[in-house]
Structures are given as structure tokens and as C-alpha cells.
């Protein structure tokens, strides 16, 4: 949803471009498709900046930038949907400003997670992805940390979002750091990068999607959440030792607050989360896993409220039993300080729950005769 005006069906088509179109509510309160259809590039994250719905992923750059081995550098691949003009544009990867290689100064390429507009700037978590073929081969392998030589792939393999090529060092060598990129505007061509060693990289992960976990409170403070997903890495050298936790960028600054850090796991018996959203004030809604990421079979079937100023996490009461919940909506709808979340269970029809963040209490609302509800939002009639 773009505000209360437009509903966009962002289609993700197994890594390829998918057809995207938008909808409005007319003066007769009927939802109507708009005329434009767009083939949006594959994307791993998305968000709203100014008049645009933006999508981003990282992929191969142009052949003009290939190295002596023919390896292509990784570049940011951006799409811009101008919601009012109903136009679609993409970035020019001939511009080296979109180079994702060595983005953090450690040789690794990154992908972006989340698009947050604050004070006309664009904040995004920069997620280190390891060394591409291009990065691994640079200057005879200077970016490969001593003792990590055996992490470089000796053949092609993997599948889907975990596929890799011979010569890559897949996944980051720096799991105990978090970076945030602060861009001047939606072009992403001018940036400042800040880092902290209090948390691991800031995003939730599911297949090829990198979920936004960087959000602003109403007072302008920006909270950066890390689920510590690197705990799931197979090799100990690439596993984070840091708890899922939260750091902050105070309003009016572009640095991490040195006096702010809270552990999520210390309040949950070691359990983490996959997604989070801002509700109101400094209250945030977290979609929690049922067990630590160091165990197998974890699933996200609980909700919790995090209060930024105190760092306190409180599980939401009033929801169906966690063992009956089979899914939640992709994103909540927020209005007048409450969050409205779709909840699907194995018994009965899915329902919308109203969540009071102050009391961390959910109240059941309308049920829908359907198998599941992927989301909930609100459209105002447009002339």
C-alpha cells in the first residue's frame, strides 16, 4: 500500500522480472486496476521513498566492467515506480556509483535490506554477502581472510538463492558487524556508511528476500534490529556470536548511539525474530521465532512488542495458541496507534487482530472466508 491511495501488487517471479500493476478505490468504493503494467526486476527488498515505490537487488554488472578473468562485478539493480505518474524506470548500471563490490572497504559485495526515508535521506542496511568471483580474484585474493582460503568454492553448486559459482567465497567473513548506508536521495549515488560491532547484520531472511529491520520512531530516532541470522551458517567462522539485538541512531545524528544497545535473546530465552515493523511512538511489532536459530525447525508463529526507549520486549497476548498459527500477513496495517495483523490458523477462517502496543494485547476482529490473508490495508476513494 502506498499511503491510503494505491495498492501495488509487486510480483516476484522466481528470480525473474514479474508483472506488477496497481489498484485504486473509485468513488463507488470499488477497487479498480490502473492501466499500467510493469516488468519489475527481480528484487530482494523494497520500500517507499518520496513518490516512489522502490525495489532493489544485487546482480551482475555490465560486461564492460569484466575483469581479466571475465568475471562481472556485482551492481545494485534498482526499480522506481512513480505511483502518481504511473511510470516505471530503472537505474543505469553503467554508472560505477552503483557498484556493490567492496562497498564496505573489506572486499565483499553487499545487498541492501530495507528502504527508510528520514529527513529526505534514504537509510538502508548494507548486508555483506561474501566475495563474488570478481572480489575473490582481486589482487590475487587479497580480500580472503587468512585461514578462510578453504571457504572459496571449487565448483558451481547450490540452488535458488543459495546457488554459487566456482571461485566465490559465499556468505560474509564479517558476521559480527552491522553496517547502515545513508544515501543522499533515491539515486543511491552518494552515501555515508556507519558501522557497529554490537549487532550482526540487520535484516530478516527468507529464501531470496531480505526483510527490512531498520525503522524510525515518531521522534526521529532510528532503530536498527538484527535477528543474528548468521547463527544459521554452516561454518563456525561465518557464524555470529552476537545476540539478536537492537541499536539506535539518534534523531539529528548520523552515527550509532554509543550508549544504546539491548539484547532480544536475553529477554526470550535465546529466541530471535524474522521481521519487525514500526507501530507508533517508539513501539515496534516483532514476528518471533518459536525457538533459537541454533536449533532446527524454527518457525515464526508469535508476536511481540518492543519499546525503544526502555528496550523491553513483551510477547503479545490474546492471539490463538502458537501451535495453531500457520501464518501472519506480510505486513500489518497501522492506524491511530494500533496495528492490524492478519492471522491464519489451522482451525477456522483467518482473522484480523487489533494489537494495542502499550498493553501488548491482541483483540480478534473480523474473520474472512478464505484459506489465508496475505495482508491488510486501507484505500480511500479516489476521484
Report residues per predicted region.
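Post-signal peptide N-terminal segment of secreted/secretory-pathway proteins
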Residues: 1-106
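Repeated scaffold domains used in trafficking and secretory/extracellular systems
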Residues: 1-2, 37-51, 100-115, 201-214, ...
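Beta-propeller fold detector
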Residues: 29-40, 83-105, 155-156, 190-199, ...
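Intrinsically disordered, low-complexity segments enriched in Gly and acidic/Ser/Thr residues
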Residues: 257-348
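Beta-propeller domains
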Residues: 174-181, 186-256, 262-263, 269-272
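Aromatic- and glycine-enriched pocket-lining scaffold segments that form the walls
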Residues: 99-207, 215
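Short beta-strand elements that form the blades of beta-propeller/WD-repeat-like
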Residues: 3-14, 50-70, 115, 120-132, ...
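Beta-propeller blade signature
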Residues: 20-26, 70-87, 138-189, 237-254, ...
Amino acid at each position: 500500500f502506498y499511503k491510503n491511495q494505491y495498492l501495488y501488487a509487486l510480483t516476484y517471479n522466481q528470480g525473474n522480472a514479474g508483472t506488477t500493476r496497481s489498484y485504486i478505490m473509485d468513488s463507488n468504493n470499488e477497487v479498480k486496476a490502473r492501466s499500467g503494467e510493469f516488468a519489475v526486476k527481480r528484487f530482494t527488498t523494497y520500500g517507499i521513498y518520496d513518490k516512489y515505490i522502490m525495489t532493489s537487488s544485487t546482480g551482475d554488472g555490465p560486461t564492460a566492467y569484466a575483469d581479466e578473468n571475465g568475471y562481472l562485478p556485482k551492481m545494485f539493480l534498482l526499480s522506481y515506480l512513480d505511483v502518481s505518474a504511473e511510470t516505471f524506470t530503472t537505474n543505469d548500471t553503467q554508472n560505477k556509483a552503483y557498484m556493490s563490490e567492496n562497498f564496505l572497504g573489506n572486499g565483499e559485495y553487499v545487498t541492501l535490506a530495507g528502504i527508510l526515508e528520514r529527513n529526505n535521506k534514504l537509510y538502508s542496511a548494507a548486508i555483506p554477502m561474501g566475495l563474488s568471483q570478481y572480489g575473490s580474484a582481486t589482487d590475487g585474493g587479497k580480500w580472503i581472510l587468512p585461514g578462510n582460503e578453504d571457504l572459496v568454492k571449487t565448483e558451481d553448486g547450490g540452488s535458488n538463492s543459495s546457488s554459487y559459482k566456482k571461485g566465490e567465497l559465499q556468505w560474509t567473513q564479517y558476521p559480527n558487524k552491522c553496517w547502515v548506508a545513508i544515501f543522499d536521495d533515491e539515486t543511491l549515488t552518494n552515501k555515508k556508511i556507519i558501522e557497529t560491532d554490537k549487532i550482526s547484520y540487520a535484516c530478516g531472511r527468507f529464501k531470496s528476500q531480505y526483510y527490512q529491520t531498520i525503522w524510525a520512531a515518531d521522534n526521529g530516532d532510528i532503530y536498527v534490529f538484527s535477528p543474528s541470522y548468521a547463527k544459521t551458517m554452516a561454518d563456525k567462522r561465518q557464524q555470529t556470536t552476537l545476540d539478536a539485538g537492537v541499536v539506535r541512531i539518534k534523531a539529528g545524528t548520523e552515527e550509532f548511539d554509543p550508549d544504546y544497545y539491548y539484547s532480544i535473546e536475553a529477554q526470550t530465552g535465546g529466541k530471535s525474530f524474522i521481521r519487525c515493523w514500526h507501530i507508533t511512538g517508539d513501539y515496534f511489532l516483532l514476528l518471533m521465532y518459536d525457538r533459537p536459530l541454533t536449533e532446527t525447525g524454527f518457525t515464526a508463529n508469535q508476536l511481540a512488542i518492543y519499546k525503544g526507549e526502555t528496550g523491553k520486549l513483551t510477547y503479545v497476548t490474546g492471539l490463538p495458541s502458537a501451535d495453531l498459527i500457520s501464518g501472519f500477513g506480510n505486513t500489518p496495517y497501522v492506524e491511530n496507534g494500533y496495528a492490524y495483523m492478519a492471522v491464519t490458523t489451522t482451525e477456522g477462517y483467518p482473522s484480523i487482530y487489533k494489537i494495542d502496543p502499550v498493553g501488548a494485547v491482541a483483540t480478534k476482529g473480523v474473520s474472512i472466508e478464505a484459506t489465508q490473508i496475505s495482508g491488510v490495508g486501507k484505500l480511500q476513494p479516489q476521484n
